[in-house]
Amino acid sequence: MSKGMIRLTSRVAWARAAIVAGLLGFLAITAATHAPSVLAQSGATDSPGDSLAARGPDPLAVPSIETFMQIGGAGSPQVSEDGSTVFFTTSMTGVDQVYELLRSGWPYQLTAFVDGSDFYRVSYTGSKVVVGSSTGGSEQSNLYFVDTDTDLVSPLRIRDKVQHGSPLWSPDERYVYFRSNEETAKDFYIYRIDTVTGAVEKIWEHAGWNEPIAISRDGNKLLVSHDESNVNNYLYLLDIATGQETPLTPHDGDYLFQYARLTPDLSHIYLVTNLNDDGISRIARKAVPSGEIEFLNGESPWETEEMDLSDDGEYLAWVENVEGYGELHARDLVDGIEAELSEMRGIASAIDVSSAGTVVFVFESATSPSDIWKYDIEEGDLAKLTHSTFAGIDQSLFTEPELIHYTSFDGLGIPAFLYLPDGWAGQPIPFVMDIHGGPEGQARPAFSRHFQYLLLNGYGILVPNIRGSSGYGRAYIALDNYRNRKNSIRDIYEGAKWLVDNGYARSGKIGIKGGSYGGYATLAALVDYPDIFGAGIDDVGIANFVTFLQNTAPYRRALREAEYGPLADSTFLLEISPVTHADRIKAPLLIVHGENDPRVPVGEARQMAAAVRARGGVVDTLIFADEGHGAGKLSNRLVYYRKMVEFLDRHLKN
């Protein structure tokens, strides 16, 4: 078969995979069924509400939210350089662990950390893995060494109250490069550890956020990123032996240089950058050291959101963000043949390219959970490697969203995904608006277990990409910065008003929810537009920008001030803080948080709840003693989402 064409695996291969899928499904359900008491484990205080079954559709026809939360998923694939071995993560045990996909198709579990793995990196041959793991959601990850030949797991770098991250193997598989804030809580320096002797050497010492990105094939040069904010970074080439630093991306203003990879001869770097006239992130080939840039997909109107180059420099793969959908592209750089997998309608992500010309990636859609796929650039073969369980739920019940655009107060078009329950009769129904975090995140048509549950229970859902979202270029992402913060909250109101004006919902029967920055946006919308919303769910959200900046992890403060404004401007920060105006909130509020959250400290939840109660408002809280920035454990998610659906039913379905 010619290059650039796509061929699915045979029926026999699918049949074999189905056997593995059945085992995966059994393992996932068994792990959840035999988990300890979720209330006891979570440390949460929960008060029962009216059951969904008492009011909603026939409970025999619609599976419970607990069943929906047990639908599986796989992520973070990596492939050995020769393309022979694939690794991935899945939470079939209740938390994320690292697995190796054996040649028989069996997923072999490599790690068994109590609170799961945070990240991992496979060596070139696939014989060694470095894994980061933390406890209680603290994000203070220690490093562990996994020998895939012996299956032994041993400590590599253990430090109390220190965050390690961004591990990178040397080509000879002896050294691991990583970032750490062990010397000063606010600065990440770069270190090298000898996996044989355990000796550690600091090789990069600059204030702020620094991380190793890529290493040359001879092991002598390291590509380093220094981040000034979430929308601005600089790349350097470090000579490891001499310490000489060569700036690769000097610039003025806010620009991104991401996913950078070195060519084997060190003559060029491939990267994704928005340093161009229209501010759209695209793939560039940048000469070293002259700095001359050539854009490889310069004609594309869409943002490039991921890119990877094989270690031999022959194969390139990238993902283009087509209005929220992620389309995978792959190119043989030797003969120029390119493939576009646009028929896969959903989101491709987490790509990793081997020197054998294989691309492993995650694919999911609104109706299919995330699984690992492999594409062979040379042969055009496309294969699904994992088959996540649907927990016994009929996939045909799931609903795809419609991409719509509504106009905000100043004429700006706001893209959004509109979900309607099957058979919607054209009359107003209870609606939920879901606001993404970041704030530079983006709402995508990804698989959402609780979205599909709500749809089957008669809810509609609107997921907007308000100004400040990524995926639409440099100008759009900057529209909510600093003193423009409340313009993005107005975008949310205009979305709710659009639902009412078009007959989808009634004013006062629209719920709003969001996590992290989306939690702030939820609270701010309830403050500024109290009559149109009937319920709010704040998940690990910011309530007070002053206390948030004072108490967030030190290494995050400067990055966040670049977005929200300096702590010195406390008058403005307090004015846009929901806790300042808690008396305006009319809708019942559910606040969810993790006790160990290093990003948005739990004090944000407690002060917001206290402020609402002091003013006679209705507020309930759910604080997980063993979580951080979001509920990561299945046992806690079961508690959270049961509480969520009962809260929404109680306040939006009356």
Where are these regions (language model features)?
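Conserved beta-propeller blade repeats
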Residues: 71-89, 114-132, 143, 160-179, ...
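N-terminal secretory signal peptides that target proteins for export/translocation
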Residues: 1-14
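Beta-propeller blade-edge and WD-like acidic-aromatic loop motif
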Residues: 46-62, 85, 89-109, 128, ...
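Short amphipathic alpha-helix adjacent to the substrate-entry channel of hydrolases
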Residues: 445-464
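Active-site-proximal cap/loop segments of hydrolase catalytic domains
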Residues: 464-654
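Short beta-strand element of the alpha/beta-hydrolase
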Residues: 420, 427-437
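N-terminal cap/lid segment of alpha/beta-hydrolase-fold proteins
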Residues: 386-425
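Bacterial N-terminal signal peptides
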Residues: 17-33
